[in-house]
């Protein structure tokens, strides 16, 4: 079994960046504490993850499975980098995409009650190298549920790439194969990560403020 790819570890006392140093939509000005991971850093890290993925999975047809909705930005950017590597390689491989939607959050807590929406026919995964792309691993329960579903279809290989992984006492111990950033136990939004469907339109990963939580609470 291949070793997991290393990640960028962000410490518990990471101060982040002042909002005034970046372009933040005015309608979120009072709803955020700080910029936690700037967009440019996300993109550079994603480019390296693409290389790690191709090194480990690039010998066979890859099915990239996007976990909606939060994973769509990371998924699109990661696949752009993978496709660039693929078309410039002497040993390019076919790649197809599929989508599944999971829901496990109410407000800022993972409920543990995981709903699978879509993915009714995942028979196309049989015999393929499957790359599941997720925005964030919190407790890990959601991904364990999805992995059990995917493995029923007997793929050749299953790997998980997540932009973020939280250090949290609620974790069940699951760790993905490819991680962009390991972060403290803070509720983050932006770059398609949401709080009750808000904040997906932020370019950066930011820490939500108590004002923001109260304003957009379900």
From Swiss-Prot:
It holds the Pfam family Pribosyltran. It catalyses: IMP + diphosphate = hypoxanthine + 5-phospho-alpha-D-ribose 1-diphosphate; GMP + diphosphate = guanine + 5-phospho-alpha-D-ribose 1-diphosphate. Binds 2 magnesium ions per subunit. The magnesium ions are essentially bound to the substrate and have few direct interactions with the protein. This is Hypoxanthine-guanine phosphoribosyltransferase. There is a cross-link at residue 115 (Glycyl lysine isopeptide (Lys-Gly) (interchain with G-Cter in SUMO2)). Homotetramer. Its cofactor is Mg(2+). Its main location: cytoplasm. It is found in: Cytoplasm. PANTHER family: HYPOXANTHINE-GUANINE PHOSPHORIBOSYLTRANSFERASE (PTHR43340:SF6). InterPro entries: HGPRT (IPR050408), Hxn_phspho_trans (IPR005904), PRibTrfase_dom (IPR000836), PRTase-like (IPR029057). The modification Phosphothreonine is found at residue 142. GO terms for biological process: GMP catabolic process; GMP salvage; guanine salvage; hypoxanthine metabolic process; hypoxanthine salvage; IMP metabolic process; IMP salvage; positive regulation of dopamine metabolic process. Disulfide bonds: none annotated. Converts guanine to guanosine monophosphate, and hypoxanthine to inosine monophosphate. Transfers the 5-phosphoribosyl group from 5-phosphoribosylpyrophosphate onto the purine. Plays a central role in the generation of purine nucleotides through the purine salvage pathway. It comes from the Eukaryota. GO terms for cellular component: cytoplasm; cytosol. The active site is at residue 138. There is a cross-link at residue 115 (Glycyl lysine isopeptide (Lys-Gly) (interchain with G-Cter in SUMO1)). Keywords: Acetylation, Cytoplasm, Glycosyltransferase, Isopeptide bond, Magnesium, Metal-binding, Nucleotide-binding, Phosphoprotein, Purine salvage, Transferase, Ubl conjugation. One of its GO terms (molecular function) is magnesium ion binding. Pathway: Purine metabolism; IMP biosynthesis via salvage pathway; IMP from hypoxanthine: step 1/1. It comes from Bos taurus (Bovine). Mg(2+) binds at residue 194. It is an enzyme of class 2 (transferase). The modification N-acetylalanine is found at residue 2.
């Amino acid at each position: 079994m291949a070793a997991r790819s290393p990640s960028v570890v962000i410490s518990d006392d990471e101060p982040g960046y002042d909002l005034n140093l970046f372009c933040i939509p005015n309608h979120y000005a009072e709803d955020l504490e700080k910029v936690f991971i700037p967009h440019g850093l996300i993109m550079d890290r994603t480019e390296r993850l693409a290389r790690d993925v191709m090194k480990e999975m690039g010998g066979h047809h890859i099915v990239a499975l996007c976990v909606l909705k939060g994973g769509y930005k990371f998924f699109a950017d990661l696949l752009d980098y993978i496709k660039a590597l693929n078309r410039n390689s002497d040993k390019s491989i076919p790649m197809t995409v599929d989508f599944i939607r999971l829901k496990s959050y109410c407000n800022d807590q993972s409920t543990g009650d995981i709903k699978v929406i879509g993915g009714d026919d995942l028979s196309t995964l049989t015999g393929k190298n499957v790359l599941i792309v997720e925005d964030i691993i919190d407790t890990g329960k959601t991904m364990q549920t999805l992995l059990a579903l995917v493995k029923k279809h007997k793929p050749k290989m299953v790997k998980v790439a997540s932009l973020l992984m939280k250090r949290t006492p609620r974790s069940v111990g699951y760790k993905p194969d490819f991680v962009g950033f390991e972060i403290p136990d803070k509720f983050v939004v932006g770059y398609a990560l949401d709080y009750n469907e808000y904040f997906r339109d932020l370019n950066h990963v930011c820490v939500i403020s108590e004002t923001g939580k109260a304003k957009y609470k379900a």
